[in-house]
Amino acid sequence: MSGALDVLQMKEEDVLKFLAAGTHLGGTNLDFQMEQYIYKRKSDGIYIINLKRTWEKLLLAARAIVAIENPADVSVISSRNTGQRAVLKFAAATGATPIAGRFTPGTFTNQIQAAFREPRLLVVTDPRADHQPLTEASYVNLPTIALCNTDSPLRYVDIAIPCNNKGAHSVGLMWWMLAREVLRMRGTISREHPWEVMPDLYFYRDPEEIEKEEQAAAEKAVTKEEFQGEWTAPAPEFTAAQPEVADWSEGVQVPSVPIQQFPTEDWSAQPSTEDWSAAPTAQATEWVGTTTEWS
């Protein structure tokens, strides 16, 4: 599809992105219409998607999107969680109309519905999950583009982009690649310079994981503040000039104090014992006499 134009050939960095995101990994089941996009089958039963065919169909889909004069006439849909963020990012970059979440039946066919719209092109993430918009597109003669896995049905799909539409990284990377090629074909960005938007912004993230990361970051910040408050207090600044002493032995005079000698006693000698019985007897006699005089 890219032909002999070297500008449209797949670069090595693009191949590395596809391999890192697992875009080439299909499922264990194979639809008969997807056989043309299969490269080989692994020993565990997983089919390998030919990335060359993926790149060719990606360029064809980008050309179809660029052919629409009004970007808002392109509807991009993803009912699965893994593609909702990528759809919103793609719509913000290219100007398309996103439908993230549940698709209201009758959006393309029921004219009295509040959400009724008449797009000129439809792009879906999964033909099996987004079967309702594909069916309604067939009623109003609407061309469709779909990211198709090895087991995806190709009924009502006009341009099938073979890729892994189950993994969050693969779906986000495919929408990022499609948005980049659309902007390049429109002339918004140059092919000589890399796009400043990273594919990570198109990846789906679980809200529980985001909440856990935010809590961990908050706890880490609080712990860091407490540590700094206890151990990294600002040291007092001394601005007074300190006296300079050349020789500390000369600067301080230490007075000499004579050492007092105490006589040594022999603690082993037994102390002299006194007769305490005589004195109490004499005192008792005196008290007796005193009491006699009172009587």
From Swiss-Prot:
Sites of N6-acetyllysine modification: 52, 89
Glycyl lysine isopeptide (Lys-Gly) (interchain with G-Cter in SUMO2) cross-link, renumbered residues: 89
Naturally occurring in which organism (per UniProt): Bos taurus (Bovine)
Full protein name: Small ribosomal subunit protein uS2
Function text: Required for the assembly and/or stability of the 40S ribosomal subunit. Required for the processing of the 20S rRNA-precursor to mature 18S rRNA in a late step of the maturation of 40S ribosomal subunits. Also functions as a cell surface receptor for laminin. Plays a role in cell adhesion to the basement membrane and in the consequent activation of signaling transduction pathways. May play a role in cell fate determination and tissue morphogenesis. Also acts as a receptor for several other ligands, including the pathogenic prion protein, viruses, and bacteria.
GO cellular component, one term: cytosolic small ribosomal subunit
Stated family: Belongs to the universal ribosomal protein uS2 family.
Site-annotated residues for Cleavage: 115-116, 133-134
[DE]-W-[ST] repeats: 230-232, 247-249, 266-268, 275-277, 293-295
Modified residues (Phosphoserine): 43
Residue ranges of the region described as Laminin-binding: 161-180, 205-229, 242-295
Residues recorded as bearing Phosphothreonine in the entry: 97
Miscellaneous notes: This protein appears to have acquired a second function as a laminin receptor specifically in the vertebrate lineage.
Mod. after translation: Acylated. Acylation may be a prerequisite for conversion of the monomeric 37 kDa laminin receptor precursor (37LRP) to the mature dimeric 67 kDa laminin receptor (67LR), and may provide a mechanism for membrane association. Cleaved by stromelysin-3 (ST3) at the cell surface. Cleavage by stromelysin-3 may be a mechanism to alter cell-extracellular matrix interactions.
Main location as per UniProt: membrane
Residue ranges the record marks as coiled coil: none
InterPro entries, A to Z: Ribosomal_uS2, Ribosomal_uS2_C, Ribosomal_uS2_CS, Ribosomal_uS2_euk, Ribosomal_uS2_euk/arc, Ribosomal_uS2_flav_dom_sf, Ribosomal_uS2_vert
Source domain of life: Eukaryota
Gene3D superfamilies linked: Glucose-6-phosphate isomerase like protein, domain 1
Subunit structure: Monomer (37LRP) and homodimer (67LR). Component of the small ribosomal subunit. Mature ribosomes consist of a small (40S) and a large (60S) subunit. The 40S subunit contains about 33 different proteins and 1 molecule of RNA (18S). The 60S subunit contains about 49 different proteins and 3 molecules of RNA (28S, 5.8S and 5S). Interacts with RPS21. Interacts with several laminins including at least LAMB1. Interacts with MDK. The mature dimeric form interacts with PPP1R16B (via its fourth ankyrin repeat). Interacts with PPP1CA only in the presence of PPP1R16B.
